[in-house]
Each structure stands twice: as structure tokens, then as C-alpha cells.
Amino acid sequence: YDNLRLADSAAYEAVRAVGREGGLVGCHCENGDLVAEGVAAMHAAGRRGPEAHPHSRPPLVEAEAVGRWLAIGEMAGCPVNIVHLSTRRALELVRAARARGQACYVETCPQYLLLDERSYRLPGFESAKFVLSPPLRAQENCAALWDALEAGEIDTIGTDHCSFRFHGAKELGREDFSKIPNGIPGVEH
């Protein structure tokens, strides 16, 4: 999402404008600079296969961005909807914001409830089928999301349907995981 990133000042102005109109801002929360550092670290270590993808985007990358967007929303007086939430740590930040009285919402996806990081341990290039962002996480994050769902803390579940053909698309990253188109199918047709 490098071409979609905003400076915090621009994000604040946009969120403030949406808030003035009574709107809600949806936020994909990953710190792009930290992701770039993670990708560079994986490359420097010679890790270029799809199994390196989750290591380039550890849970803290999501949590930092969730905290930042919650702060921007609070300062701007605009509710935020954190989309594709995948970690317990990010969920705890949302809980803290809600405890302060901040209006914020959470969306997660079936893949974060049902799949985990073991999908990145498949033989050969098969793990490329599971390259998405945020990446699949450790099982304890899945369990935390299920608990939050049962407690009514997750407001929506969305598919984030973003499918790519394995042959001809996902294969673009055969030599470099950072070139694999991110996304998995979320709708059967």
C-alpha cells in the first residue's frame, strides 16, 4: 500500500473533515515504514520466500498503527473503524480507547478467526496462497478474536475478498515474497 500512505498531518486533516460531516473513517492499520524495514531485514537475511511475509509485518506493526489511528480519530473528533484487525495487542488498544469513551469500531475477517501462521509453513511456494496483509497470526490471536467476537467487541466481520490467481499472479513473487500480490479469496462463487 505504499502508494496509499498518508503523512499523519494529512490523515488528521482528512479525518477531521470527515468528523465535521458526521462520518466514520475506515483504517487499514499497518505502519508502512516499519513494514519496509521488516521487508529489508528479511531480504538482508536472505529470506525471500512466502514464509518470510509474516516476519516482515509482526503484530507490533499493526498495534502501532491502531494506536496512532485511534489517537488521530480522538483528536479529530471522528469515530474510526479499524478494519482487518488480527492481533490481541491491537484489540487491547481498542478496549482502552472504548474505556475512555472513544467511539471506535472493529472489523475482523474469517481468515483471522480460522487460519493461523501455520499456513506459512507449507512446502514449496504453496504458502504464497496465504500472503495477505495483515498476515495470518499465531493461534493465540485467533483465540483472542473469537473471545472478543463472543463478547460483542467486534462490530463486523468482512471478507476483505481480494483474490489473485496462483498461476500468473501470486507467482510474480516466486523470487521475492514482497512481490506476491497480497490477498486471498473470501467469497465463494
Regions flagged by a language model, labelled:
Residues 3-157, 173:
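Histidine/acidic residue-rich metal-binding segments in metalloenzymes
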Residues 62, 175-189:
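Gly/Ser/Thr-rich active-site loops/lids in small-molecule metabolic enzymes
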Residues 160:
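Short phosphate-coordinating micro-motif centered on Lys-Gly-acidic
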Residues 168-170:
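Cytochrome P450 core scaffold surrounding the K-helix E-X-X-R motif
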